[in-house]
UniProtKB/Swiss-Prot annotation:
EC number(s) on file: 2.5.1.60
GO cellular component: Rab-protein geranylgeranyltransferase complex
Known regulation of activity: The enzymatic reaction requires the aid of the Rab escort protein REP.
The name this protein goes by in its record: Geranylgeranyl transferase type-2 subunit beta 1
């Protein structure tokens, strides 16, 4: 399905990945589509951002995407994973990111959306994901990233938010989902990303964290999320983006990681899997292409490691009043 037996590195089959993403949206009755129905907003963000990184966002109907996206907004201001589902901070960020891709943030009632996010901050500075109250540093990142894109960071207590994130730092330099929780690459991205956006990276022990992150690279070149786990393409994003934000990306073997990602492609039908020869999906296709972007692979647009959006999109947001 994916890798070749020769030592020669395969190339990125970008056109096939574009076709795979466009076809995936049309296969409403497929197993993948059915099981992902409740998080379609995330799937849309993964697919659309991949298309943008490959300079093919124009292949989709902007009007159709935005029309569907707005049906997912709840009266609270938050967005759900699909029409008729409950709102959650995770899907709200994905919705805002999608609108950013299309330069359509102005269609939002920004005050309403930002208030929904801000109300999820707890007294200790942490954030809940929704009204049910689960707390996780993922939600801290999501809130900070979302409000930064909307230019509404002043709606939360940033100092308390940063203090809570720092309280989740471990002796190995990494970060967990809550204070005392095990360090994990996904949580590290969230914490480092939030600290980067708020200008608080001085709280990170860059050498200790950099060492922990570069130890995630295995012999085949791929990265895992924590010790003793298998390599997975998605960590090409979580680990690499964090290393870039703390200026330690030169500590890993980039060429071997590029080969690992490329070997996870389905060269016939498009899409990228978690590891060579496994089934492809939208999630890993996005993180594989995003990882190649961070690795400066030819033909892939540059992605911002903190905002997880193409740099041209982020620049447009930052420099627009």
């Amino acid at each position: 399905m994916s890798s070749t037996s020769s030592s020669q590195m395969v190339q990125l089959v970008a056109d096939k990945h574009v076709r795979y993403i466009l076809m995936a949206e049309k296969k409403k009755e497929s197993f993948e589509s059915v099981v992902m129905d409740h998080l379609r907003m995330n799937g849309a963000y993964w697919g659309l951002t991949t298309l943008d990184l490959l300079d093919k966002l124009g292949c989709v109907s902007e009007e159709e995407v935005i029309s569907w996206l707005m049906t997912c907004q709840h009266e609270s201001g938050g967005f759900a994973g699909n029409t008729g589902h409950d709102p959650h901070i995770l899907y709200t960020l994905s919705a805002v990111q999608i609108l950013a891709l299309f330069d359509k943030i102005n269609i939002l009632d920004i005050g309403k959306v930002s208030s929904y996010v801000a109300k999820l901050q707890n007294e200790d500075g942490s954030f809940s994901g929704d009204m049910w109250g689960e707390i996780d540093t993922r939600f801290s990142y999501i809130a900070i990233c979302c409000l930064s894109i909307l230019k509404c960071l002043d709606k939360i207590n940033v100092e308390k938010a940063v203090k809570y994130i720092v309280s989740c730092k471990n002796l190995d330099g990494g970060f967990g989902c809550t204070p005392g929780a095990e360090s994990h690459a996904g949580q590290i991205f969230c914490c480092v990303g939030a600290l980067a956006i708020t200008g608080s990276l001085h709280h990170v022990d860059k050498d200790s964290l950099g060492w922990w992150l570069c130890e995630r690279q295995l012999k085949a070149g791929g990265l895992n999320g924590r010790p003793e786990k298998l390599a997975d393409v998605c960590y090409s994003w979580w680990v690499l983006s964090s290393l870039i934000m703390i200026d330690r990306v030169h500590w890993i073997d980039k060429a071997k990681l590029v080969k690992f990602i490329l070997d996870c492609q389905d060269l016939d039908n498009g899409g990228i899997s978690d590891r060579p020869e496994d089934a492809v999906d939208i999630f890993h296709t996005y993180f594989g292409v995003a990882g190649l972007s961070l690795l400066e692979y030819p033909g892939v647009k540059v992605i911002d490691p903190a905002y997880a959006l193409p740099v041209d999109v982020v620049n447009r947001i930052i420099f627009t009043k």
